[in-house]
Amino acid sequence: MLKQINGGVCAAKGFLANGVLCGIRKNRTKRDLALIMSEVPAAAAAVYTKNLVKGAPLLVTKNNISDGVAQAVICNSGNANTCNANGVEIAEQMCQLVSDTTEIKAKDVIVASTGVIGQPLSIDPIASKIDDLVEGLGNNSDLACEAIMTTDTKKKEIAFEFDINGVTCRIGGIAKGSGMIHPNMATMLVFVTTDCAISAKMLDKAVKADVETSFNMVSVDGDTSTNDMVSVMANGLAKNELIDEEGAAFDAFCEALHGVTSYLCKMIAADGEGATKLLECTVSGAVDDINARIIAKSVICSSLFKAAMFGADANWGRVLCAIGYSGADVDVTAVDVSFESCKGRVDVCKNGAGIPFSEDEAKTVLLESEIKVVISVGNGVGKAVAWGCDLTYDYVKINGDYRT
């Protein structure tokens, strides 16, 4: 059972964090450089964007943690360090700066960047503030969380306590993501820390399995970023028996990990650029989970559906349309659709055809800030959940002048 606690990435034993302003982008006053550090080397795992254009930090991180070990994360916002001729060199220098000011090896540093693509990233502002960044390390998950934000309007962090064979463990995470959210593992960065003792092999297995039902089920605008990354460090300081195989302990860890990731997914979707509503699509009765995920993701990605939700329009035909072109193995004559919110539920489609409903009641349901579209596609065992947001005028405004 999970117990929500405070602390974010600093909730787990032995983790410190900080965030400072180093001035990567001109005329900005927000923090733009974050550091998360474990007091001891930790098992590490990560998943990355499937975009063929990858940020230099991802390439460096993938090489650094190929041995399954990391001890720190450094991340800048305001510049993606992507499509830069010297990008890898800059990312490696960021790792070396951490090493020079701590006792951590440069190869044990996870490095990440988020921001504008194709603009040179100078190491100078980062180097000028690395001492302040390290000296200020403490229980400052919120500062690190602020420092990785770009167009985000809200900080995204969470932590839980959970039990492994009678031993209390903790896990926490921070995330950024508001636009370019359509991961295939927005820009989406997620950093998770835990004091649970788990082998790098099993951690990698847990992370790769989890993203299929968490971050890969989130979409804000259908754009897959060049810099998407989800990383997890597990330092073992909870002193539970090492999890090195499948079983009850591994299942408990996976449940805790999913508690963090699913919470952050909802926060990312709700904070979509210009968004006014969090959308959740649940699918049941599919042939299998894979087909259920295809259906849920297709609906949540539909621009027409998202626009209808912005207008509180119960246009269920757009849901059926998205199901039809999804490519899923589905009998469209067996599809039922309902809309739900805190104001109630309205059934709009039965067996693939419209049914009478009150437009006024539907409008009342859809005017809320959190909307569920509930879809049943038959009697199969497959089910899935996907998250997204409505499509508004402000999304265009935000992205029309992003570089300025």
Segments (PLM) and residue ranges:
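A structural signal for small-residue-enriched, beta-sheet-centric alpha/beta enzyme cores
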Residues: M1-E89, Q93, S99-T404
